[in-house]
Amino acid sequence: GLGDVYKRQIESYCTDTETPLVISVVPEEKAPELLLRWPRLRMNNERNWKDYLYRAEDMAAFAGRKYSGQRNHINKFRKEYPTAKFVPLTGADMPLIENFWADYEQEFQKTSFNAKRELAYAKALARLLPEGWLLGGGLLVDDRLVAMSLAENCGGTLIIHVEKALYSHQGAYPTLVQAFAAHFGGDCVYINREDDAGDRGLRTSKLQYLPVRLAGKLRFEVQCEADRLREIPTVTTPRLTLTPLEERDEAAYNALCLDDARNRWWGYDLSLIHI
């Protein structure tokens, strides 16, 4: 099929460019298919990159004792900001969103490279809202945006790419989560709030919403026979002995590399290389 054609093209490219074949963000259910194609794989399934999956109906209702904490935070937010309302966001709301980013950065206290990069990516994604394929929504308090989310509906799963709220407005996050799920998740079975990237605070928060599953995103490194060798082998023939290089071989190796006359026998001329 077409998938096999793509796999062959990828293999050819990696062979021609001497690039290691690495496949990332592979859903767990796709692993058997890759193992059939490449039986020698090194797999990585890091906890930091597992996606948090929730039932859409749970996020939209927060029903039952297990969600009493979220409901309490929402009630406090509604009491503190009685005029707050959820609104869908479109490309026409870009000025409102830009003002939100300005307010958000005033309260943003994380200094790590990853945190700053994630914020930059979130802002870049928001600029794509006018293209029409993103779902956007936010909380307005007196015509000021205090929280916003960006998502996609992919095959019955609502994937939340961005979820931001002003820290000064306590309870804004659970209020946003519930309102966004209620508005956009009606035809969805699951809501994917993506990974926590190893951030402790984010992990604690996402676990408090009681995910039904942590979905792995596998990383495969395709290997060859040579990758199975634990050490460089010693090969002996009547005329040749091949052994691993040692420190004492440095002078002889350098002399060989700089011997132009001898190197011509191997099909290359180092004198033609200009630095």
Language-model features: locations:
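Short, small-residue-biased leader/transition segments that mark boundaries at the very start
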Residues: G1-Y6, I275
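GNAT-family acyltransferases
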Residues: G91-E105, E225-I273
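Acyltransferase donor/substrate-recognition loop-hinge adjacent to the catalytic core
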Residues: P39-K110
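Conserved GNAT acetyl-CoA-binding A-motif
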Residues: T17-V26, G186-E194
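A conserved beta-strand-loop-helix scaffold within acyl/acetyltransferase catalytic domains
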Residues: K85-L166
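Aromatic (often tryptophan-rich) hydrophobic motifs at membrane interfaces
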Residues: W133-E221
